[in-house]
Amino acid sequence: MATKNNPSPKPMGTAQGDPGEAGTLPAPEAGIRDTGSTQLKAKPKKIRKIKALVIDLGSQYCKCGYAGEPRPTYFISSTVGKRSAEMAADAGDTFKETYVGHELLNMEASLKLVNPLKHGVVVDWDCIQNIWEYIFHTAMKILPEEHAVLVSDPPLSPTSNREKYAELMFETFGIPAMHVTSQALLSIYSYGKTSGLVVESGHGVSHVVPISEGDLLPGLPSRVDYAGCDLTNYLMQLLNEAGHKFSDDHLHIIEHIKKKCCYAALLPEEEMSLGLDELHVDYELPDGKVITIGQERFRCSEMLFKPSLVGSTQPGLPELTATCLDRCQGTGFKEEMAANVLLCGGCTMLDGFPERFQRELSLLCPGDSPTVAAAPERKTSVWTGGSILASLQAFQQLWVSKEEFEERGCAAIYSKC
């Protein structure tokens, strides 16, 4: 569901209004309560500004920070460590049951690692609560009841998600106001636009979402269940086939190799004909051993264009995008969408990906002349769009207050989000 009556966003740095404001709240000492028979003249209320937070919960990292800032302040792993019942019984009351963020780094006991999102959809709400508790109390060291919160929601996720977000925020954390809106909508705002075709590929899922004047075109958003984590796993497979010995325990190393050494080839067939001397790079492992990486550098990214390489029957990202463009024909928005294809998400940050994607999409849609844009900060496009939106003066009327939620329940969420 699109945010209703959203104001037009502007690129970061030109947002209207005071950054991060979410209206005002009376200070704790404001006024004197009437206790009954004695009538006391109330003191003038002191008004304090409250800074809004923006939280983008992704499959790999939860990105958070204050509205009005150009980039997130914190990147917190979306993985939660839980002790088993046996471990908890052995430890008694001396250890916590769940661990988030840096708490996972110094744990000697083995933990069950849980990711609360599967392909971008929340599957464990207890873990979401654990992550938010860590954000408020440990990372940011703030009182949640003093801050409005804007939360991003993946496209095509159940509408009940928004109700759960509201229940957690209002009932568990006591925040004064909140808003939930689509990740795709926030991504397009990061480009300073309200219309375009968002092609977003993060860690756990990829989406193609057409948006016109701030509204998601109904029935047209598409998704595929592959993204950056699948690319990482495929790179590990290719490296092992080349004689290396990596396991799931080394995925953080493979992730670093992907970011530092890999790319998408514009013409993969020509790249395959290059000699090792022209392709290879040396990479030093944490133990000091140096390995040589050759064709794996670009072969790993081919799975984004040919998902069959990793056993998926779903279409590649260019094909998914071309299909979505064709479906826009009947709505009259095809030309507008083709002129504004916007890449978002960390998986699209791979060197050479925008150029390769542009080439493949142009071959699939020769008559549409698609134009692909790739903003430098697109890895955090969802969060940045939220920061812009929550800073706009015209947006402040769209916050759902705690009082509204208590009076109207979920109807308050759906009337403004």
Curated annotation (Swiss-Prot):
GO terms for cellular component: cytoplasm; cytoskeleton; nucleus. It comes from the Eukaryota. The modification Phosphoserine is found at S8. Keywords: Cytoplasm, Cytoskeleton, Phosphoprotein. InterPro entries: Actin, ATPase_NBD. It is found in: Cytoplasm, Cytoskeleton. Gene3D superfamilies: 3.30.420.40, Actin, Chain A, domain 4 (3.90.640.10). Its main location: cytoplasm. Residues 1-39 are annotated as: Disordered. It holds the Pfam family Actin. Belongs to the actin family. This is Actin-like protein 7B. It comes from Rattus norvegicus (Rat). The gene is Actl7b.
